[in-house]
Every structure is written in C-alpha cells, then in structure tokens.
From Swiss-Prot:
Organism: Nostoc sp. (strain PCC 7120 / SAG 25.82 / UTEX 2576)
Gene behind this protein: hypA
Pfam families: HypA
A GO term, aspect molecular function: zinc ion binding
Binding residue positions for Ni(2+): 2
Cited PROSITE patterns: HYPA (PS01249)
PANTHER family, alphabetized: HYDROGENASE MATURATION FACTOR HYPA
UniProt-listed InterPro entries: Hydgase_Ni_incorp_HypA/HybF_CS, HypA/HybF
Designated name of the protein: Hydrogenase maturation factor HypA
A Gene Ontology biological process term: protein modification process
Family recorded in the similarity comment: Belongs to the HypA/HybF family.
Length: 113
C-alpha cells in the first residue's frame, strides 16, 4: 500500500506550509489514472495526521478523470485505464489529465496577534 508513504509526504508538506498553524481543510486532486486509491489516502490521513497541526482537518479529495489526445487525428478521448484506443484506430495517445496528485488548497486557522 504505497498510499501510506504518499499520505505521510502530504502531511509533511502541509505541516511545513502551515508553520505550526492549525490546518482546517485540505483539498487534494488525484487523477483516476494515478494508481492512487482515494479511500486509502483518506484512511491513512486520519492515522498520519494524529498529533500534528493537521489532526481533525477535513481532507477533501477531488478525482480527476483520465483524458488523452490522439497523436494521429487530434481527438480527445476519455480514459478509464492508462492506455486506450482512439476512434480512428490509433493507440498513440498523449495523456492530458488523470495522472496528477496535487495539494490544491490548504485552509489554516488565522492567528490574531
């Protein structure tokens, strides 16, 4: 389960960014072609965030669908797997979306001094 290591890195990156401030919400974008299971990341997040400034934060995960462009005819096609075939018969596709893993938003508590 590589999601544990990925989630540990996400917690470390967000903790560094928050600089000790309490994190309320995180929005991740995970591509459907990335081989990362959103449910596993959610499960690991609850464990990895314990005792950190992220504990209790809401983790929102937005899944990004797979999309590719055919090198032969230029058509864009939806992908459910990291490979596919275009309507023109070509298998030469460039993936446009679906492989990403991004920390898109981080919401931290404001500290008034």
């Amino acid at each position: 389960m590589h999601e544990l290591g990925i989630t540990q890195n996400i917690v470390a990156i967000v903790s560094e960014y928050a600089q000790g401030s309490k994190v309320n919400r995180i929005l991740l974008e995970i591509g459907k072609l990335s081989a990362i299971m959103p449910d596993a990341v959610q499960f690991c997040f609850d464990i990895c965030s314990k005792g950190t400034s992220l504990e209790g934060a809401v983790l929102e995960i937005r899944e990004i669908p797979g999309l590719a462009k055919c090198r032969q005819c230029g058509a864009e096609i939806a992908l459910e797997k990291p490979f596919g075939i275009c309507g023109c018969g070509s298998v030469h596709l460039d993936v446009i979306t679906g492989e990403e893993l991004k920390i898109k938003e981080i919401e931290v508590e404001e500290v008034c001094v």
